Amino acid sequence: MVQQTNNAENTEALLAGESSDSGAGLELGIASSPTPGSTASTGGKADDPSWCKTPSGHIKRPMNAFMVWSQIERRKIMEQSPDMHNAEISKRLGKRWKLLKDSDKIPFIQEAERLRLKHMADYPDYKYRPRKKVKSGNAGAGSAATAKPGEKGDKVAGSSGHAGSSHAGGGAGGSSKPAPKKSCGPKVAGSSVGKPHAKLVPAGGSKAAASFSPEQAALLPLGEPTAVYKVRTPSAATPAASSSPSSALATPAKHPADKKVKRVYLFGSLGASASPVGGLGASADPSDPLGLYEDGGPGCSPDGRSLSGRSSAASSPAASRSPADHRGYASLRAASPAPSSAPSHASSSLSSSSSSSSGSSSSDDEFEDDLLDLNPSSNFESMSLGSFSSSSALDRDLDFNFEPGSGSHFEFPDYCTPEVSEMISGDWLESSISNLVFTY
């Protein structure tokens, strides 16, 4: 190894000396080695017509000026340092050819022109046809052609076996790289599609999100969550009130300005509670996605049936005069009487919490209201409020559906006492609500 490096250094020194001496060195090199036109070695081989024909009959191209010069110089380097690798010799020859002056290249250019004319005379029908490699180049060319359809097979075959394998590897790499991108595309899409629905259902948790059908999920608004509590103008509120009867589970009057459009508050005398009160969902348009939140109120199911009455089968006009009526906020407000065109089936669902037991509180109504409002799913349709024999069973079922952390942001468990309920349902709230609703 040391001897090889020493030989390389000696060769470099020799070549550097030749290039530094410019003309003299070149003349010395030319004098020491046979001239391009001499017949000693290169000239004789070039003059022989069979020098460019291989044993298989393939005709080689005529040499250019660099090939003529490099053939002479390569033989010199190989004689001086036989252990030097052929690639290293070619690298050094290329650098030296670039450093040669044009005047020094003239004799080799003339020799190359002479060889070209001789080649034309010897082979008049010659046409450059690169030979396709049969052994290893075929597989490389096939794989490269599949990876790069625009690449010609001649170009691949012209390269060496190593280059062909590198081309094939590059083609395979190019074809395999888009595959992970394509595979990760559905993941990104699925995550971006799936996440908004998970974020849009804060109250139901994973159970409510899983119970949504695609049609009901399509009805969910994709905008900001504040669009649920959209404030209506008086002109927009008038047709909404005239097209559907006014009845809903009224929530406690926290944030009344935010919720005044979503629900119509029913305050008034006890005797008026026996009048028919229909659900808003009876005539609400199920195809309107915002109707679920604005017109439909808490009791609007996707098929338009009313879920507003807590227990329509167990409610009675006599029970509506019990003190539980104040806790349910279900008496009619004198300022907004229900229209006479209420549906007949809605008259059976009187005051929302009329027959509730004394243990039930206003927070149950609030929980039920927000749960139905944020989860218009088929589970609540099957859990239709008229199918329960008593409101206590409904309370138990609603309490069972609520889990910690899955309720809406309107939960106030501290205000569950009857005293607070009576305070909230007092007469002072009626005037403030009516002012908020009708005074803009």
From Swiss-Prot:
GO CC, alphabetical: cytoplasm; mitochondrion; nucleoplasm; nucleus; transcription regulator complex
Disulfide bonds: none
Compositional bias annotation for Polar residues: 1-10
GO biological process: ascending aorta morphogenesis; atrial septum primum morphogenesis; cardiac right ventricle morphogenesis; cellular response to glucose stimulus; endocrine pancreas development; gene expression; glial cell development; glial cell proliferation
Result of knocking out the encoding gene: In T-cell-specific knockout mice, loss of mature Il17a-producing Vgamma2-positive gamma-delta T-cells and reduction of Rorc expression in immature Vgamma2-positive thymocytes. In a mouse model for psoriasis, dermal inflammation induced by skin application of TLR7 synthetic ligand imiquimod is substantially reduced due to the absence of Vgamma2-positive gamma-delta T-cells.
Source organism superkingdom: Eukaryota
Main location (coarse class): nucleus
GO MF annotation list: DNA binding; DNA-binding transcription activator activity, RNA polymerase II-specific; DNA-binding transcription factor activity; DNA-binding transcription factor activity, RNA polymerase II-specific; miRNA binding; RNA polymerase II cis-regulatory region sequence-specific DNA binding; transcription cis-regulatory region binding
Subunit composition and interactions: Interacts with UBE2I. Interacts with HDAC1; interaction inhibits the transcriptional activator activity.
Function: Transcriptional activator that binds with high affinity to the T-cell enhancer motif 5'-AACAAAG-3' motif. Required for IL17A-producing Vgamma2-positive gamma-delta T-cell maturation and development, via binding to regulator loci of RORC to modulate expression. Involved in skeletal myoblast differentiation by promoting gene expression of CALD1.
Protein name from the UniProt record: Transcription factor SOX-4
Organism, as annotated: Mus musculus
Gene: Sox4
